[in-house]
């Protein structure tokens, strides 16, 4: 029977540890770690994600500072808000909720975030440092996936990992993190030819493509580790990027959808904010 990589249970365990660390930091410095979240516009899903992150802050004893900006906000106005947060010594982490309205240069705004406060791992500088094996906060979803693999004693070194997806916040950093852990990595995307054949070679498969059940169950080889980073609402529940029905008969381990990667994304963001606060406050 396949091992279920339960992200929800692991996230709860990590949050319990973070609560202790936050209390220790408060006792030592009299200061509370603060995550600033910036929401631009009125996208309902984005507002939900920001609320979930605020709830996670409260669970570990942190504070969150919510910045809400109107839909018509310009790049210059958003950059000015980010600069204020960079300069605010009470703020230890900055999250710019993706996506932003089309008129905003999202990349310029991500890269304006101070490296020390880039707890969501979105800056080019942070990505470059991570890719070179230097200290930086990793993009939250792939960093959460690496924690799931590590905590479940999944062997990565020497394994063939296939990452399906090449986005700047998921596919690319995921591939770099697996490479740093000594996997042999193949990156696939929408233009990849012979995708089923490449997936069949994977010891570890990561679905990060953003298309519901694109990766078919019969593409996956016996004994593979299956990580599904996608979520697509369906019939009151949801599915991922990988066809998971019956996957326990094929995989040696897999992340369920929901309850696998998702909870660890938010917990990783919170953990990296606590780490940033510990560094800033000594």
From Swiss-Prot:
GO biological process, one term: L-histidine biosynthetic process
GO cellular component, one term: cytosol
UniProt KW keywords: Amino-acid biosynthesis, Histidine biosynthesis, Hydrolase, Methionine biosynthesis, Multifunctional enzyme, NADP, One-carbon metabolism, Oxidoreductase, Purine biosynthesis
Signal peptide: none
Pfam family of the protein (one): THF_DHG_CYH_C
EC number of this enzyme: 1.5.1.5, 3.5.4.9
Catalytic reactions on record: (6R)-5,10-methylene-5,6,7,8-tetrahydrofolate + NADP(+) = (6R)-5,10-methenyltetrahydrofolate + NADPH; (6R)-5,10-methenyltetrahydrofolate + H2O = (6R)-10-formyltetrahydrofolate + H(+)
InterPro entries: Aminoacid_DH-like_N_sf (IPR046346), NAD(P)-bd_dom_sf (IPR036291), THF_DH/CycHdrlase (IPR000672), THF_DH/CycHdrlase_cat_dom (IPR020630), THF_DH/CycHdrlase_CS (IPR020867), THF_DH/CycHdrlase_NAD-bd_dom (IPR020631)
Entry binding sites for NADP(+): 165-167, 190
Domain of life of the source: Bacteria
Pathway recorded for this protein: One-carbon metabolism; tetrahydrofolate interconversion
Recorded GO MF terms: methenyltetrahydrofolate cyclohydrolase activity; methylenetetrahydrofolate dehydrogenase (NADP+) activity
SUPFAM superfamilies: Aminoacid dehydrogenase-like, N-terminal domain, NAD(P)-binding Rossmann-fold domains
Entry's family note: Belongs to the tetrahydrofolate dehydrogenase/cyclohydrolase family.
PANTHER family hit by this protein: C-1-TETRAHYDROFOLATE SYNTHASE, CYTOPLASMIC, C-1-TETRAHYDROFOLATE SYNTHASE, CYTOPLASMIC-RELATED
Primary role: Catalyzes the oxidation of 5,10-methylenetetrahydrofolate to 5,10-methenyltetrahydrofolate and then the hydrolysis of 5,10-methenyltetrahydrofolate to 10-formyltetrahydrofolate.
Binding partners and assembly: Homodimer.
Stored HAMAP family: THF_DHG_CYH
UniProt protein name: Bifunctional protein FolD
Organism per entry: Acinetobacter baumannii (strain ATCC 17978 / DSM 105126 / CIP 53.77 / LMG 1025 / NCDC KC755 / 5377)
Taxonomy of the source species: Bacteria, Pseudomonadati, Pseudomonadota, Gammaproteobacteria, Moraxellales
């Amino acid at each position: 029977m396949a091992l279920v990589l339960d992200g929800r249970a692991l996230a709860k365990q990590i949050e319990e540890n973070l609560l202790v660390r936050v209390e220790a930091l408060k006792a030592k410095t009299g200061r509370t770690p603060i995550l600033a979240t910036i929401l631009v516009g009125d996208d309902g899903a984005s507002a939900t994600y920001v609320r979930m992150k605020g709830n996670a802050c409260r669970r570990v004893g942190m504070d969150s500072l919510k910045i809400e900006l109107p839909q018509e906000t310009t790049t210059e106005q958003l950059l000015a808000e980010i600069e204020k947060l960079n300069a605010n010594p009470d703020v230890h982490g900055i999250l710019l909720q993706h996506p932003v309205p089309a008129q905003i240069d999202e990349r310029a705004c991500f890269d304006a975030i101070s490296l020390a406060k880039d707890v969501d791992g979105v800056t080019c500088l942070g990505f470059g440092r991570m890719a070179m094996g230097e200290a930086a906060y990793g993009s939250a979803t792939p960093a959460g996936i690496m924690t799931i693999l590590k905590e479940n004693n999944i062997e990565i070194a020497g394994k063939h990992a296939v990452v399906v997806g090449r986005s700047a916040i998921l596919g690319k950093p995921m591939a770099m993190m697996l490479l740093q852990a000594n996997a042999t990595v193949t990156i696939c995307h929408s233009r990849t030819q012979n995708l089923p054949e490449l997936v069949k070679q994977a010891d570890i498969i990561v679905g990060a493509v953003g298309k519901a059940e694109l990766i078919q169950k019969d593409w996956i080889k016996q004994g593979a580790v299956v990580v599904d980073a996608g979520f697509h609402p369906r019939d009151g529940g949801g599915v991922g990027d990988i066809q998971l029905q019956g996957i326990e008969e094929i995989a040696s381990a897999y992340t369920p959808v929901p309850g696998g990667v998702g909870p660890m994304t938010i917990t990783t963001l919170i953990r990296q904010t606590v780490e940033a606060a510990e560094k800033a406050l000594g």
